[in-house]
Amino acid sequence: TSAQWMINLMLAQKGGNYLDADGNVNITSDEMIEVLTYIKEMQDTGAFATIPGGQPDNEEAYPFYNSGDYAAQIMPFWQTSRYTNYMTDLKGKVAIAAVPAFEGSVVQTIGGGGTGTAVVASGEHADLAAEVMAYIKLSAEASKEIWNVLGFDPVNTEVWTDTELTQNPDNQFVQYFTTYPFDVLNEVKDSIGLLTCFTDEKMPSINNEF
């Protein structure tokens, strides 16, 4: 319950943000009220439920997916590795699909962290570190291994259409899921948005509110 992946997504679909026009933290906006009201109503009908452990990537949650108590989750792409590592019984039974969107939404999905990585500007070799970081995050070579090893969606979207990579029958993630994961990414590629507050220094304060 301390993670807001689904709330972030729905808020972006509504065109909202956690900051107001003046850059102040605002978690009571009209868009946020609409999102939380929708979630509560879905919970009241029994369609939504909080997973044991509070969020889908906690170890307490995995047995309940394995047993079929929960049919779906809305999570960032890095969750693929949790399936291959912790929910092996579900191999060949899980599909990756585009998330539902509110009618009229320009944004269908957003990027969701995840653990951030930064280069300290005051470091002795900050420029070199930045070059290395850019290579391992953005180059085609590194992007392919980000998918092959970690199961993450690479930031470099050029590799998304490389079917030798994305449909490789020897890839553990291609073998696990019943759909080609990158087919979904390419389907929503032009409607990926973001919450601008993600890069704001106030983001930790927003997390504290929840």
Short names for language-model regions:
Residues N58, M75-Y83, T115:
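Beta->alpha turn/N-cap motifs
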Residues N8, L36-D44, Y62, N66, ...:
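Non-transmembrane alpha-helical segments in soluble domains
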Residues T45-F48, N85-V159:
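Extracytoplasmic/periplasmic substrate-recognition and gating elements
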Residues V174-F210:
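C-terminal capping/gating helix-and-loop segments adjacent to ligand/active sites or protein-protein/ligand interfaces
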Residues N24-G54, V99:
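Glycine-centered hinge/linker elements that transmit conformational signals in sensory
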Residues T1-V25, E31, K40, A61, ...:
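Extracytoplasmic/periplasmic solute-binding protein
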